[in-house]
Amino acid sequence: MSARIADIAHFDGFWTTRPAESRPGQRYWYIGKIDGVINYVRRMSEWTVTAALFEFGPDNEPKPIIGIVHAPALGLTYLAARGAGAVRIHKTAVGEKRDKVVPSMTSSLDGSVLSYGMSFLPGESQRALDVASSLAGRPADIKRVGPVSLDLCKVADGTYDAYFEPMLHVWDIAGIAAGTVVVWEAQGTLSRWDGERIHWRHDNDVVPSNGLIIRELQHYLQQYPWLDSINQR
């Protein structure tokens, strides 16, 4: 993927080899490895390959502006670009089907369908499980499939109404960024659990949503703040 993308004009390099200091307007591709390695190894269909293009803004902070999430085993590809919307391409037996990506209109946690992510680190996983337990009786269902890039896209296309993950690390950036652009361009919302913006050069907790249930959900998320997770690691 990197070799093919290298032929594209108007970008300044790759995220992992970018200089220590970047200038406003510079753009770098981040090519992800397999997102959902455990699913892949266990021959589940829910795994992806991802790519995201970052642009440094006037404040010298990076922001993803193009996102690609490809799930080969599912025959699904999500594409999104800043200001151009998001599209889902579904390969079927009779050809490709292209749909505009739009989130759900669910306006309450009651009867909603949520998804969440977990970590291989016990303290981080416990934080997610605590939130899921506290939500019992509100959503119609809470799913756990992964990976994060696909879960973000499923929030964007209305499969889920929201998703929460307690800790995403720097090695997750490609998948998070690609899925984030899909969410943004579908007019969904995405932030940290405390409502602050994502920091693209640091670890994050994340909560994308359809934008209609985020305040209700954050009431539960904020009962389990970031420092609790860090202290348990």
Please annotate each region the language model reported.
Residues A20-R23, R42, D59-E61, L79, ...:
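Solvent-exposed alpha-helices and their adjacent loops that cap or buttress functional pockets
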Residues V101-R233:
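An extended, acidic
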Residues G25-K91:
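DPxDG-like acidic metal-binding loop motif
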Residues E61, A80-A81, V94-S107, Q218:
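Short amphipathic beta-strand/extended segments with alternating polar/hydrophobic composition
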Residues I8-A9, N60, A186:
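Helix C-cap/helix->beta junction micro-motif
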Residues M1-D35, H219-Q222, W226-R233:
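N-terminal subdomain of lithium-sensitive/metallo-dependent phosphomonoesterases centered on the IMPase/IPPase/PAP
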